[in-house]
């Protein structure tokens, strides 16, 4: 075993840390984006329209709900784009909670936008709600795409409810969750072609193009680009597979210049083992030993299809990685006694910390 996984010792570069003030800046930027959206709505006679009659007021409120919904939708895209500064400052658990809150708030506001807009247009045109809904969907530019976007986002929200999520495998839930990106993309033409702010205000157009492009850049750079670059750079592969106990397997992984991968004991990565069909599904596994030069170790318990495949991995199998993620590291310890609680295979990050 020792000979099979012996690796050269190389000084590990300490992973970068996010400054403490970054938390305040990130929160301020998110709040500022909501204020800007409200200010743009106000500048486009949003408040005056509230007082111009019931139908016009409903339409104006619906427009505000749609704008705030779109802004929150982009905020949640950035939250889950795995931007390193956000990950290091907050950790994925907190980011995931905020993403969930922003997502549900955005969807509820989106439903409010649809309801108020239909009621407002129906009141102005003096026709029935169903007839007005049909007219909006069929005749307005981008509305068919927006309807498809609403259906996709509804699917994501329904499967994110805890009762529904417990019935789904993680891999299935994660795949369904990715449809949110398609939903955001399909909603954009509606805003471009029929959105009052886009059509009437150059300042609003500049703002929305900026935030859409920033969200897109965040996904392309941090969610897709960085993991691809690290996987190509480090060329990680399975070095050895060790049966630790019935149903428990450790995998040693070797790579090029792994001492440059900014990972600490206690963190986890998303692993894709290129061992055949199903390789595209990522699995979150924590390090079960501190990084050693050009070696990493994970320990996995057989709890499902993905983890069961780990025991059958062969040395030389190539691996794609995302991460590292997580804030359970010695970096945040400031001295004094601590209590670490874990059970089952959840012990693995603590083993790495206490090694």
Question: For each predicted feature, which ranges?
Answer:
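Helix-to-loop transition at the C-terminal end of transmembrane segments
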Residues: 46-48
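Short, intrinsically disordered terminal tails adjacent to the first/last structured region
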Residues: 1-12, 256-257, 324
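Membrane-interface segments at the starts/ends of alpha-helical transmembrane spans
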Residues: 51-61, 131-140
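FNR/FR-type flavoprotein reductase catalytic core
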Residues: 9, 30-44, 66, 70-73, ...
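Ferredoxin-reductase
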Residues: 62, 228-320, 329, 336-338
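Helix-boundary and loop/linker segments of multi-pass membrane transporters
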Residues: 19, 57, 94-96
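N-terminal membrane topogenic signal
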Residues: 12-30
């Amino acid at each position: 075993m020792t000979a099979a996984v012996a690796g050269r010792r190389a000084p590990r570069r300490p992973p970068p840390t996010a400054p403490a003030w970054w938390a305040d800046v990130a929160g301020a930027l998110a709040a500022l984006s909501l204020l800007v959206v409200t200010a743009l709505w106000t500048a486009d006679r949003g408040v005056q329209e509230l007082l111009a009659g019931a139908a016009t007021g409903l339409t104006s409120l619906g427009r505000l709900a749609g704008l705030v919904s779109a802004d929150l939708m982009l905020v949640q895209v950035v939250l889950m784009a795995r931007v390193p500064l956000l990950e290091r400052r907050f950790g994925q658990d907190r980011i995931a909670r905020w993403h969930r809150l922003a997502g549900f708030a955005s969807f509820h506001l989106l439903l409010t936008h649809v309801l108020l807009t239909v009621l407002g247009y129906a009141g102005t045109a003096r026709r029935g709600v169903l007839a007005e809904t049909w007219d909006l969907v069929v005749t307005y530019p981008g509305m068919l795409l927006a309807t498809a976007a609403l259906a996709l986002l509804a699917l994501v929200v329904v499967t994110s409810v805890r009762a529904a999520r417990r019935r789904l495998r993680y891999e299935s839930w994660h795949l369904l969750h990715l449809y949110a990106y398609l939903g955001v993309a399909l909603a954009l033409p509606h805003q471009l072609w029929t959105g009052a702010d886009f059509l009437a205000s150059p300042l609003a157009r500049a703002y929305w193009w900026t935030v859409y492009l920033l969200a897109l850049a965040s996904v392309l750079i941090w969610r897709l680009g960085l993991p691809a670059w690290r996987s190509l750079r480090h060329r990680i592969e399975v070095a050895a597979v060790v049966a630790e106990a019935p149903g428990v397997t450790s995998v040693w992984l070797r790579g090029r210049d792994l001492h440059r991968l900014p990972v600490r004991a206690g963190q986890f990565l998303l692993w894709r083992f290129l061992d055949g069909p199903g390789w595209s599904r990522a699995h979150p596994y924590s390090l079960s030993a501190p990084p050693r030069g050009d070696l990493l170790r994970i320990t996995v318990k057989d709890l499902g299809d993905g983890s069961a495949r780990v025991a059958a991995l062969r040395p030389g199998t190539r691996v794609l990685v995302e991460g590292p993620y997580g804030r359970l590291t010695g970096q945040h310890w400031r001295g004094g006694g601590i209590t670490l609680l874990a059970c089952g295979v959840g012990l693995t990050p603590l083993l790495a910390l206490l090694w």
